[in-house]
C-alpha cells in the first residue's frame, strides 16, 4: 500500500503521484508520514519536504502552507513549490549566502522578520539542490 501525495500551489498542481513515505517540514520540526498514518492537519514551515518513491528520495522546496493526512492521502497546500530541476545551483548558493549575511546584519524587529523569511526561503532552495547532488 502507498500514499497518494498531492502538492498544490495557487496556480497549479505541482505533484500528484504515489509515494512510500513523505517527510514534511512542519512548524514544530520534521514529521514523517507512512501508510496508515493517523489523520491530521498540520501547518508547514518554509523548508524541504522529502518524498520517497521506488527507493528514490525527491526533495521539494515548500514555501509554507498546510498538509492534510487522511486515509493514505497526503494533500499539501503551499504558496509555492520548487524542485531541484527548476533551481539553478549557483543562483541558489549565492541567494543563500546573501540572505544569511542580510539576516546577520538585520537590525530591528521588522528587518529581522523580513530577513528571516528571505533566509528560510533561500536555505530551502539551496538544500534541495544540494540534496539532489545537482
From Swiss-Prot:
UniProt xrefs under InterPro entries: ATP_synth_F1_dsu/esu, ATP_synth_F1_dsu/esu_N, ATP_synth_F1_esu_C, ATPsynth_dsu/esu_N
GO function terms (MF aspect): ATP binding; proton-transporting ATP synthase activity, rotational mechanism
Transcription keyword on record: no
Entry keyword set: ATP synthesis, CF(1), Chloroplast, Hydrogen ion transport, Ion transport, Membrane, Plastid, Thylakoid, Transport
GO cellular component, one term: chloroplast thylakoid membrane
Task performed by this protein: Produces ATP from ADP in the presence of a proton gradient across the membrane.
Name recorded for this polypeptide: ATP synthase epsilon chain, chloroplastic
Source species: Chlorella vulgaris (Green alga)
Gene that this sequence comes from: atpE
Amino acid at each position: 500500500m502507498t500514499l497518494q501525495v498531492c502538492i498544490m500551489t495557487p496556480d497549479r498542481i505541482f505533484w500528484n503521484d504515489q509515494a512510500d513515505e513523505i517527510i514534511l517540514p512542519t512548524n514544530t520540526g520534521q514529521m514523517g508520514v507512512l501508510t496508515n498514518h493517523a489523520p491530521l492537519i498540520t501547518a508547514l514551515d518554509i523548508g524541504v519536504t522529502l518524498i520517497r518513491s521506488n527507493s528514490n528520495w525527491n526533495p521539494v522546496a515548500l514555501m509554507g502552507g498546510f498538509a492534510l493526512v487522511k486515509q493514505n492521502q497526503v494533500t499539501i497546500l503551499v504558496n509555492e513549490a520548487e524542485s531541484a530541476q527548476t533551481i539553478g545551483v549557483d543562483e541558489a548558493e549565492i541567494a543563500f549566502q546573501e540572505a544569511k549575511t542580510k539576516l546577520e546584519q538585520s537590525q530591528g524587529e521588522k528587518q529581522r522578520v523580513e530577513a528571516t523569511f528571505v533566509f528560510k526561503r533561500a536555505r530551502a532552495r539551496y538544500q534541495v539542490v544540494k540534496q539532489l547532488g545537482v
